[in-house]
């Protein structure tokens, strides 16, 4: 993840928290450097899981989003996903709902984000 990616995403989403783009401000925090915007981390890790999990589905939402460790520019993030449940849709014949837990890990295998999401897929 590049510093520019974080700054661009932070500015595009109008996040004015200087912890994400002001190195001087961030130097005075416990982390001593800018943090990657957590919504960028959520978007990135979701995107990393799409090809394997939801490429032809519809995301119905996230829940239980946790950020146990910070992400910094220069970190390498990977995703892993576990299927928690599956069922046929009650309102849409021919479709199913899959619930998954996805974790994002950095290059030190530290979990930096974890969330559940539900996806509607055609059967």
Segments the model singles out, each with a brief description of its role:
Residues 1-61:
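Hot-dog-fold acyl-thioester-processing enzymes
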Residues 32, 68-69:
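Short, surface-exposed secondary-structure edge patches
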Residues 62-67:
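Short alpha-helix capping/helix-loop boundary micro-motifs
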Residues 71-76, 80-123:
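HotDog/MaoC-like acyl-thioester-processing domains
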């Amino acid at each position: 993840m590049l510093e520019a990616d974080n700054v661009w995403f932070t500015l595009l989403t109008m996040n004015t928290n200087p912890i994400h783009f002001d190195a001087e401000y961030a130097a005075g925090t416990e982390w001593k450097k800018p943090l990657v915007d957590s919504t960028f981390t959520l978007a990135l890790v979701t995107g990393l899981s799409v090809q394997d999990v939801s490429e032809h589905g519809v995301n119905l939402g996230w829940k239980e989003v946790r950020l146990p460790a910070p992400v910094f520019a220069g970190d390498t993030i990977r995703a892993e996903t576990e299927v928690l449940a599956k069922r046929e849709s009650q309102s849409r014949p021919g479709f199913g709902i899959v619930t998954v837990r996805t974790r994002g890990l950095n290059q030190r295998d530290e979990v930096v984000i974890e969330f559940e999401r539900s996806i509607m897929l055609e059967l």
